[in-house]
């Protein structure tokens, strides 16, 4: 309950800022020390403006760094798998607990809408760089929406070279674009069914198993600790224990 209260407090703060931004969004207007400059090769804005534009980041207690979440209900493949018995999406954690609170849902949908903003890529990169974190997880809730979204994620990763990015996905079409992914991004295809073998056609994957897990989190207070396997391109597959 305490963790939920912290999450709601953080989301509420970001939501307030995001709403103010949306109310004044549109063509950038000159303001003292808060003007957004747009040039062909770069975008410059204040960190506070970037936060308002993208709708905030999340800070999962288990993770060593920051994350970014979208509505799980809007997962293209996951929204179908959640109805399938024995799938890795059955009983999805992002569809219960703190995630179902109205303030969290509203914040996630604002983030989803903001992806189409022309300044989203630059704002995300600025925000991630401002955290000075070595590790970032995409979509602790939700998934890649389409090719345009994926290309924007690639661009954000290139603009944050000091950060290692991890993108788990159940969208099989993403495989066609793996060769375009920047070196600091690891894309892991998540096997759709529990105890299903990792597909050999993907360079990096994750699976959910009833026995033989490799993720150490359950043995260390449900936290990553010093493990960074999910971000390591040399780790072929990460096996999570079934919840």
Regions found by a protein language model. Name each.
Residues 2-15, 19-20, 37-243:
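Class I S-adenosyl-L-methionine
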């Amino acid at each position: 309950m305490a963790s939920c209260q912290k999450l709601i407090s953080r989301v509420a703060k970001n939501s307030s800022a995001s709403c103010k931004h949306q109310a004044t969004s549109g063509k950038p207007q000159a303001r003292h020390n808060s003007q957004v400059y747009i040039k062909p090769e770069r975008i410059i804005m204040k960190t506070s403006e970037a936060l308002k534009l993208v709708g905030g980041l999340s800070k999962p207690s288990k993770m060593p760094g920051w994350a970014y979440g979208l509505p799980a209900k809007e997962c293209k493949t996951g929204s179908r798998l959640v109805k399938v018995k024995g799938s890795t999406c059955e009983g999805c954690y992002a569809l219960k607990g703190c995630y179902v609170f109205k303030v969290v849902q509203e914040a996630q949908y604002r983030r989803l809408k903001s992806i189409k903003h022309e300044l989203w890529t630059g704002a995300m990169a600025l925000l991630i760089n401002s955290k000075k974190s070595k590790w970032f997880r995409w979509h602790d809730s939700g998934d890649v929406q389409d090719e345009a979204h994926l290309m924007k994620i690639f661009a954000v990763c290139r603009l944050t070279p000091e950060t290692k990015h991890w993108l788990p996905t159940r969208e099989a079409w993403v495989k066609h674009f793996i060769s375009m992914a920047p070196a600091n991004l690891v894309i892991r295809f998540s096997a759709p069914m529990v105890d299903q073998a990792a597909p050999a056609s993907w360079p990096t994957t994750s699976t959910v198993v009833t026995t033989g897990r490799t993720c150490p989190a359950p043995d260390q207070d449900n936290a990553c600790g010093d493990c960074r396997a999910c971000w390591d391109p040399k780790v072929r597959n990460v096996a999570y224990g079934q919840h």
